[in-house]
Amino acid sequence: LIKILPQLTLLVREQPDSRVHLFGYPEWQTYTKDHLEAFFELDTYFYSSFYTNNLLPAAITFTKSYRKWYGKEMDERYPKFGMLGFDTGYFFLKGLSRYGSGLEKNLDKMDLVPIQTGFKFQRVNNWGGFINRKVFFVRFTKNFELIKLDFD
């Protein structure tokens, strides 16, 4: 990434009519702080099963509450395990409060907006459990917008 970004940004600047979109991997979110400007300039996309925009009110509130409760910042890892635990717990506890023992048959009706981790469960087979098939596309547009797209 560190080798290709300067080359691609140079190409886009020298040939502004060229259509360049950069598509990357989930671990690219770990490089956002270092390459934010290039990500916007190159209209960058990456896919991930987890992502949070730290500027959204829910993320800000969660981060402040985490700091208050635990007296420290969340580790800079991806996924952020504090948020992963919250999203997972909230999803299933809310589901149990709504549907009780019928949650398994109503997973597709859960319409919560998580902070970081999405859920879309699919049964593996009649005798097995479920797998989470939720994937997001994260896009950094040339207009400096950060968009988290649901991909079902």
Where are the language model's segments positioned?
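Extracytosolic ligand-binding ectodomains
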Residues: 1-152
